[in-house]
């Protein structure tokens, strides 16, 4: 059940699904939804992800039935049929996904029968059942992946050096492109080819043939369980779940070893690790003591919360006080996995771990800890830091006061950027 | 109390899906022979809930309860960002977030109703912040399932200290986002002002301004009013319950935006005897003069305002002359909201530019006045009555090849055309100072188009090459439905496109 939430850090299921489709090259989402859903979802996801708009179709350029009272009463399938026809006529695209909003979901328009009319003619038009009320952004992310698996992915012969990299959600992770790029750079050094679906203008073809992969790497402590299981069941692609964004030498090297272990690339991995760690420490040793010691709190999605907490505690010797995970985690085993990642640290005393999405409750939780001198969070959290006069660094969704292109905090290189940004914020 | 429904489509002779040449449209409108029409294919709109929320989100002693699934606060992030920047521009030491609480309607609530959750959310708002006002926004979902937001608000009247103001801004009620402003004011009237008259305060003017007005613009407009000895009650941006309550004590009202508070000002005149000036947006010399004279006339300051205008002209006209030399004869395509599109069109006249295309969301009696005025200056130009619809915009702009596009640049910049716009919510655009800022901005962009030119070589637009050859208005269909003014949408019966020719 979705709880009443102040200052939510997410959009609806429709917004989450759209974040995925709008990040795929030459794909057009079509909304069967109210007038405004296009803007609300784009503003809610991409707009809060470092202030950009998806390049192909987004916001008010998204085809939409703009359902009004008449459609609520009489149904909107005729309107939808016209809208799909119009979209097919004017857009250059490899696939069209028809996304349901609350209005069509509540009045139960039969979207699939309309999209079937088009797919029967061989046109790539697919239904996605994602009305906003089904849940938050992550629900939409899961629905979108299920839909890609249902409609796009086909079996392909195994390619031993191909991996799929999942778990980093477009836009909902404002640094998704940079994070993908850094992890892909590292995996390519292992001699692998990497599908992300979303970067380097990969598109429908990469998704269709993703069943050829030797391994699915899911960088998230809780997302895409169903999708990973389906890949395994339908195409025999096994998965490696990596719980949290690897940031810095320690976690990234562990990540590299884990991947290499699964694919029999051990020797090569050690060479990559040696080279990359030398690169990182080559820089770190030029700014020793540049940042004074901090007692820090993290307020972020689970991937960022784990990555930042572990890097600052294990690799940078800052003192973790509390980490607040803002994802709406509902499975107890996921909470346990996340808590383990956050508390099994090398030398540092583990931080308090709290799961909370409500802005007011997050502030009260922070109140209960004394002597926090650094708050790593989102734009939402700047207010708290200002009030208390503590340093604040904005590295997690929602971000509306920074422009983000390809910046990353992931991997080896990203950890250096994180330290740079912490210094800038002094 | 208001008799106006808050739905802009219900106003007489109002069109939202139309395209053609300005002379033909003006003639058709004059003869009352424009038929009702609709687009059989359309891109996304802005819903009225977005406008209702953005209008109020900087009220300092308020909490905003949104009765909706979580997606319906997506655009609140824009409003909150503007609010945060606005606080910074006002020099506030601690920059706050707007207090937004969403009931997060889910599947269970859709089936069983969400009134319990709404009640709880209002109590939470009250307990956390003890605000003076709690605004409750409806959504498509809450409206369709029939949740009674008035009933919940009413039942809590004795329990919470705040005034609870329910706003009926369900997105499906209107395709015109400006309806959301009206809906918000209707509720403020009903729940805050309640028809109570107050003693008048001399020289006090209600100055209604939407969120899109920058701090610099507020300062300029307030300066202009102060010169006339007028005190502005600036509403509802950065205002408070106290300022709302002062509304009935004003001697006059005016608005900075043409579609903001216009219906509300009529109501204030009828119910509280407050006359109002509803002219134009104060952008460009002609419009700023016109706007200024309108306000001055309310207070019998016609002579004073002429003196000030003369002095302002003496100050800015020589500088405008310099800008005019850089812009004279340049062909321009303008896209904007109702107020801004026409204001920009008047502005380009100050600089001797030639209007070749205009995209504006509504064609009605007010628009007709502007179009007729512009027809007199520019002859014939293309009019696209659309709220954005980027597919039509890029089609028209590619064919018309203007020297500059004024509007949201996201799409036309990729065609390599210099772009700029007059909706810069964090920077100046208004009054006499704003003219210089805008003029230099337009001229600088035209003279230095490198970014867009290089961008066009690499950037992608999602449309087929064939679309650019097609009739931009081919999806606009007239139909034998109800006359304009009726809200329901009869299915377009594959009728004739309105006017086909685009030069």
Predicted regions located by residue number:
Chain B
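An N-terminal assembly and electron-transfer interface module characteristic of large anaerobic redox
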Residues: 1-503
């Amino acid at each position: 059940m979705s709880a009443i939430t102040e200052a939510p850090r997410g959009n609806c299921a429709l917004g989450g699904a759209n974040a995925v489709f709008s990040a795929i090259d030459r794909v057009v989402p079509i909304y069967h939804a109210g007038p405004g859903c296009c803007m609300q979802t784009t503003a809610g996801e991409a707009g809060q992800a470092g202030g950009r708009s998806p390049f192909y179709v987004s916001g008010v350029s998204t085809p939409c039935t703009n359902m009004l009272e008449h459609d609520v009463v009489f149904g909107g399938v005729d309107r939808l049929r016209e809208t799909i026809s119009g979209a097919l006529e004017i857009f250059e695209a490899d696939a069209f996904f028809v996304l349901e909003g609350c209005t069509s979901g509540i009045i139960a328009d039969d979207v699939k029968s309309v999209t079937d009319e088009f797919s029967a003619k061989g046109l790539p038009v697919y239904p996605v059942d994602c009305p906003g009320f089904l849940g938050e952004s992550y629900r939409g992310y899961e629905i979108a992946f299920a839909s890609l698996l249902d409609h796009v992915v086909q079996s392909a012969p195994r390619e031993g050096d191909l991996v799929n990299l999942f778990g980093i959600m477009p836009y909902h992770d404002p640094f998704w492109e940079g994070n993908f790029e850094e992890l892909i750079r590292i995996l390519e050094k292992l001699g692998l080819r990497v599908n992300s679906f979303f970067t380097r203008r990969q598109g429908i073809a990469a998704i269709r043939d993703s069943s050829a992969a030797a391994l699915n790497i899911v960088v998230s402590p809780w997302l895409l369980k169903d999708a990973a299981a389906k890949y395994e069941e339908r195409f025999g692609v096994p998965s490696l779940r990596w719980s949290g964004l690897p940031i810095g030498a320690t976690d990234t090297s562990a990540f590299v070893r884990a991947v290499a272990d699964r694919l029999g690339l051990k020797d090569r991995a050690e060479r990559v690790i040696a080279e990359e760690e030398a690169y990182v420490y080559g820089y770190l040793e030029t700014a020793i003591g540049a940042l004074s010691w901090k007692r820090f709190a993290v307020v972020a999605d689970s991937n960022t919360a784990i990555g930042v907490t572990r890097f600052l505690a294990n690799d940078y010797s800052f003192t973790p006080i509390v980490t607040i995970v803002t994802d709406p985690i509902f499975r107890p085993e996921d909470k346990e996995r996340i808590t383990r990642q956050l508390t099994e640290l090398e030398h540092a005393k583990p931080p308090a771990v709290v799961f909370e999405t409500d802005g007011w409750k997050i502030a009260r939780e922070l109140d209960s800890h004394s002597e926090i001198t650094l708050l790593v969070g989102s734009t939402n959290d700047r207010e708290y830091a200002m009030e208390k006069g503590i340093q604040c660094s904005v590295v997690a969704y929602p971000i509306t006061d920074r422009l983000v292109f390809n910046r990353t905090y992931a991997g080896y290189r990203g950890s250096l950027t994180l330290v740079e940004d912490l210094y800038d914020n002094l | 109390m208001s008799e106006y429904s808050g739905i802009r489509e219900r106003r007489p002779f109002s069109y939202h899906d139309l395209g053609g040449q300005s002379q033909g449209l003006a003639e058709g409108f004059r003869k009352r022979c424009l038929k009702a029409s609709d687009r059989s294919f359309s891109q996304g709109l802005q819903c009225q809930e977005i406008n209702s929320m953005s209008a109020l989100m900087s009220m300092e002693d308020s909490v905003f309860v949104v009765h909706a699934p979580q997606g319906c606060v997506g655009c609140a992030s824009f409003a909150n960002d503007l609010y945060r920047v606005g606080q910074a521009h006002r020099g506030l030491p601690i920059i706050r977030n707007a207090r937004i609480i969403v009931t997060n309607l889910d599947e269970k609530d859709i089936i069983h109703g969400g009134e319990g959750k709404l009640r709880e959310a209002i109590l939470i708002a009250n307990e956390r912040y003890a605000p003076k006002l709690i605004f409750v926004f409806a959504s498509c979902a809450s409206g369709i399932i029939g949740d009674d937001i008035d009933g919940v608000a009413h039942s809590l009247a004795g329990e919470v200290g705040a005034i609870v103001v329910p706003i009926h801004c369900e997105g499906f009620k209107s395709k015109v986002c400006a309806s959301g402003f009206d809906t918000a004011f209707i509720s403020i009237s009903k729940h805050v002002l309640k028809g109570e008259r107050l003693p008048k305060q001399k020289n006090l003017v209600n100055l209604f301004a939407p969120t899109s007005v920058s701090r610099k613009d507020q300062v300029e407009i307030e300066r202009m009013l102060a010169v006339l000895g007028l005190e502005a009650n600036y509403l509802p941006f950065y205002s408070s319950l106290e300022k709302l309550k002062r509304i009935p004590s004003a001697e006059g009202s005016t608005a900075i935006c043409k579609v903001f508070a216009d219906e509300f000002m009529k109501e204030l005149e009828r119910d509280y005897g407050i006359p109002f000036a509803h002219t134009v947006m104060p952008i460009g010399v002609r419009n700023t003069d016109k706007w200024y004279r309108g306000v001055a006339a309310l207070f019998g300051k016609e002579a004073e305002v002429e003196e000030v205008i003369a002095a302002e002209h003496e100050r800015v006209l020589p500088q405008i002359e310099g800008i005019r030399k850089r812009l004279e004869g340049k062909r321009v395509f303008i896209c904007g909201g109702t107020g801004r599109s026409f204001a920009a069109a008047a502005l380009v006249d100050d600089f001797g530019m030639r209007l070749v295309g205009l995209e504006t969301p509504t064609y009605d009696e007010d628009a007709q006045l502007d179009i007729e005025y512009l027809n007199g200056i520019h002859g014939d130009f293309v009019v696209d009555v659309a709220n954005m619809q980027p597919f039509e915009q890029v089609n028209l702009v590619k064919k018309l090849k203007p020297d500059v596009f004024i509007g949201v640049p996201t799409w036309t910049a990729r065609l390599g055309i210099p772009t700029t716009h007059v909706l810069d919510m964090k920077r100046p655009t208004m009054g006499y100072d704003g003219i210089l800022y805008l003029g230099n901005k337009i001229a600088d962009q035209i003279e230095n188009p490198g970014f867009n030119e290089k961008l066009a070589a690499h950037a992608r637009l999602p449309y087929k090459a064939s679309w650019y050859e097609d009739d931009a208005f081919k999806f606009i269909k007239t139909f034998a439905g109800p006359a304009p003014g009726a809200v329901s949408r009869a299915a377009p019966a594959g009728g004739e496109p309105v006017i086909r020719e685009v030069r």
